[in-house]
Amino acid sequence: MAGHSQFKNIMHRKGRQDAQRSKLFSKLAREITVAAKLGTPDPAMNPRLRAAVLAARAENMPKDNIERAIKKAIGGDSENYDEIRYEGYGPGGVAVIVEALTDNRNRAASDIRSFFTKSGGNLGETGSVSFMFDRTGIIEYDADKASADDMLDAAIEAGADDVVSSEAGHEIYASQETFRDVAKALEAKFGEARKAAVIWKPQNTVAVDDETGEKLFKLMDALNDHDDVQNVYANFEVSDALMAKMAG
């Protein structure tokens, strides 16, 4: 369970650390527009768009902003963004995956490479670390939506792979192939999830000391602060004391 908790806390630092709401909303809007462009502008029929809208709602992004981002795609937004995945190693040899949406591939690559180098790590080729992660669906519900037993029973019946329940809520994991069906089944029973997305989940995590952990968090913060970066994933664990310190 500790691994699940660490993974969740590390991945969620982005929201807590990003004090610049306008920058966060800009990133969320970019993902909504791209998702709507690539598929239908109806979230009910477009899983990626639905995930983007849920993420925006979770950050209290105004409804008007969400609708405007979707209309941008419908109206043939002139901005074109490339989806790029960067992979590399951070301090302590920790594997890191960076997902970006950029209108300037050269700038993004140069900036991200610089972040890795300054941290003492190095940016690798595509595929250099992704084999250590699984492409996994995650669905989250608030703790008061159901008891741990009820959520577990419903998730297993729907075809989920794993469920982790705590005071913070319920995390349901499903394969990329079954994710959409599991999400639909749970929504029919418990209502709309607070999050439903496909992520890179580490197969195993590496425990690092506090000094290395601080360097890794600094790298992740620098990456997350970049306008083009949408998501950052890594396969490390830190002490509870450091997690509390960095979250404070």
From Swiss-Prot:
Predominant subcellular localization, coarse grouping: cytoplasm
One of the Pfam families matching this protein, by short name: Transcrip_reg
Top-level taxon of the source organism: Bacteria
InterPro entries: Integrase-like_N (IPR017856), TACO1_YebC-like_2nd/3rd_dom (IPR048300), TACO1_YebC_N (IPR049083), Transcrip_reg_TACO1-like (IPR002876), Transcrip_reg_TACO1-like_dom3 (IPR026564), YebC-like (IPR029072)
GO biological process: regulation of DNA-templated transcription
Gene Ontology CC terms: cytosol
Ubl conjugation recorded as keyword: no
Key words of the record: Cytoplasm, DNA-binding, Transcription, Transcription regulation
GO molecular function, one term: DNA binding
Subcellular localization(s) per the UniProt record: Cytoplasm
PANTHER family per the UniProt record, alphabetical: TRANSCRIPTIONAL REGULATORY PROTEIN YEBC-RELATED (PTHR12532:SF6), TRANSLATIONAL ACTIVATOR OF CYTOCHROME C OXIDASE 1 (PTHR12532)
Family in the record: Belongs to the TACO1 family.
Name the record gives this protein: Probable transcriptional regulatory protein Rpal_1287
Organism for this UniProt entry: Rhodopseudomonas palustris (strain TIE-1)
